[in-house]
Amino acid sequence: MIRIGTRGSLLATTQAATVRDALIANGHAAELVTISTLGDRSSAPIETLGVGVFTTALREAIEDGRVDAAVHSHKDLPTAQDPRFTIAAIPPRQDPRDAVVARDGLVLGELPVGSLVGTSSPRRAAQLRALGLGLEIRPLRGNLDTRLNRVSNGDLDAIVVARAGLARLGRLDDVTETLEPVQMLPAPAQGALAIECRAGDSRLATVLAELDDADTRAAVTAERALLAELEAGCSAPVGAIAEVVESIDEEGRVFEELSLRGCVAALDGSDVIRASGIGTSGRARELGLAVAAELFELGARELMWGEGNSPQGS
């Protein structure tokens, strides 16, 4: 029996259940084990709780043998690799884009100046401000139902959340607008899951690897390499999205490339620096580092450490 650790929220258990069911479909007995995390217990802003707020407890459960593996929202994992664990599988990704849920079926551009829009993501808040729509950003915590209720009860005019979460809970009918990357770049690895186990557990890793999706792994690797490079001393809002795309060479042959777009925004929305690049799936990390380097050349470091943003440390 493979014991799969998961956070206790409805979204987390729904995500983990897709992994459990896929393992069972492949002939492997599996069950879910709920683990409480600091991020679930605290109502404080996420950025004040430190790195690994949703993942540390799950990793501890793997290490002390309460579970064999854990399912994470990939974007919650610290970018620094922990040698005690291995990401054995990254299943096919859900839609990585952000979504708007607004009153009266409105889209962002239809909301009046001064409308209250909820998000606790600095990345979303910065890019919303950069759109220049005169929206008032308000903090947003709690599970997805709690967030949606703040629109339906009139507390907020709109919220911006990950489309993938709404999809997994069957709430896509609530979406009034899906934001294209040109409007708002998603968080690196948004919409992707990471299935983690002990680094030395090669037998289990082989079983879990049956669920791995090569294109998703390449995209997430590029996005998180960009993030890791940019996080060297900054807490700025960073967005990134990579995708495997088909291209045609001069002789008409079709081949696949990995496309990556990234951005860094000032927290107050006064500036957004964007860069992009093309590479191969086999060199996804190098692509992420190259686009990060271009962002630095365009002034990302000054933007990140400028007024309104502050470095995380030395």
UniProtKB/Swiss-Prot annotation:
Which cofactors is this protein said to need? dipyrromethane
Q: Broadest EC class? A: transferase
What is one Pfam family matched by this protein?
Porphobil_deamC
Keywords tagged on the record: Porphyrin biosynthesis, Transferase
Query: What EC designation does it have?
Result: 2.5.1.61
Recorded family membership: Belongs to the HMBS family.
Query: Any remaining note in the record?
Result: The porphobilinogen subunits are added to the dipyrromethane group.
Q: What's the protein name?
A: Porphobilinogen deaminase
Q: What's the source species for this entry?
A: Mycobacterium marinum (strain ATCC BAA-535 / M)
* Organism lineage string: Bacteria, Bacillati, Actinomycetota, Actinomycetes, Mycobacteriales
